[in-house]
Amino acid sequence: MGKQEVKTRQGERVAIVAGLRTPFARQSTEFSQVPAVDLGKMVVSDLLARTDIDPKLIEQVVFGQVVQMPEAPNIAREIVLGTGMNIHTDAYSVTRACATSFQSAVNVAESIMAGAIDIGIAGGADSSSVLPIGVSKKLAASLLALSKTKTLGQKLKVLSGLGLKDLMPVPPAVAEYSTGLSMGQTAEQMAKTHGITRAEQDALAHRSHTLASQAWRDGKIAGEVMTAFPEPYKKWIAEDNNIRHDSTLEGYAKLRPAFDRQYGSVTAANSTPLTDGAAAVLLMREGRAKELGMEILGYIRGYAFSAIGVESDMLMGPSYATSKVLQSTGLALSDLTLIDMHEAFAAQALANVKMFASDKFAQENLGRSKAMGEIDMDKFNVLGGSIAYGHPFAATGARMMTQTLRELKRRGGGLALNTACAAGGLGAAMILEVE
């Protein structure tokens, strides 16, 4: 495999100029009535205002939404139309489950590398509160048949075949389509397979909340989070509302397992909650950013995606994707100043941390002669992770990118890894650089 270079044909790098997100809110709280498309428009509009860039200069928007809304299937285009951009701005939507905004950022970066555009916006938004509630297959078929009837008798005949259970709403699926397993069940399997104890999971969750709380108190997060005024505009939200500012280890021990009631160790407290929110990043060709006098936050140095089986260890994507991106960039784990891994579950994150250091795993699964290396926990999720901040599926990648770049800048520059697992056995990894 040749060395990956995230550059244009003229050798210019892809710069991330700015990043912004809404506060992340637990399901059915401050954003309970705000659909994902409105969250997306909200954050992109504020991003454009903060960077003081003419919206007409944006040439492409790539945005993602995991929980699709039938009435707005192309969230990216709705954002263009709702934020004052040129109506001719290219816009399309992507989904890679929990790694969606890594994918959208890569798509914009590749458009810049190809010379198709100079400036683009990437990101994602999701609402776990405003959901598409479906109907049973029998009711759906009956409604379709009903639309084709002409007489009252025909209508009554169609309706007579429906029972009360057919009228029950069908909530969105929370399990893998191919296996029927939920993410939580997979996290339980990974905890058992890799010997991740309840105490270790609770300790990571406590660490995540403690570090996130401290980061907010130290003023490190506010600059990348907008103040949102959701309709009917009678209140606002300026901070994430999932973070436990009074987190104690003893508190986690009180919760019962959520997925294996008798023998399990994965609980609601050592997992990330269902969350509403949006995040976006502004990307530019390096030279164009300098022409416009924009301060550059950092650069994308490399990226990789992975796919593995879904029957077991489905959330091991970070280990596979990180191996690929380290190989393609010629870097070692020791070259990194920071490592930020998405915490879908403490069990999943800790299992991946364990596999990073496993020679056996590297030889059997990664095609490496030895492990990638032991993760220095002083570099790992230093501002807390998704367990604390929350996880609006499509927005998490952009949150991680912005948060990591700003922290790298505070530390005087360097290289950082962002990596995430995703449904379907997918994984994502990105190397970011700040000079």
Curated annotation (Swiss-Prot):
Gene3D superfamilies attached to this UniProt entry: 3.40.47.10
- Protein EC: 2.3.1.16
Report the subcellular localization.
Cytoplasm
The protein's UniProt keywords, in alphabetical order, are: Acyltransferase, Cytoplasm, Fatty acid metabolism, Lipid degradation, Lipid metabolism, Transferase
* Alphabetical list of SUPFAM superfamilies matching this protein: Thiolase-like
Q: What does this protein do?
A: Catalyzes the final step of fatty acid oxidation in which acetyl-CoA is released and the CoA ester of a fatty acid two carbons shorter is formed.
**Protein name from the UniProt record:** 3-ketoacyl-CoA thiolase
Species source reads Vibrio vulnificus (strain CMCP6)
Q: Which gene encodes it?
A: fadI
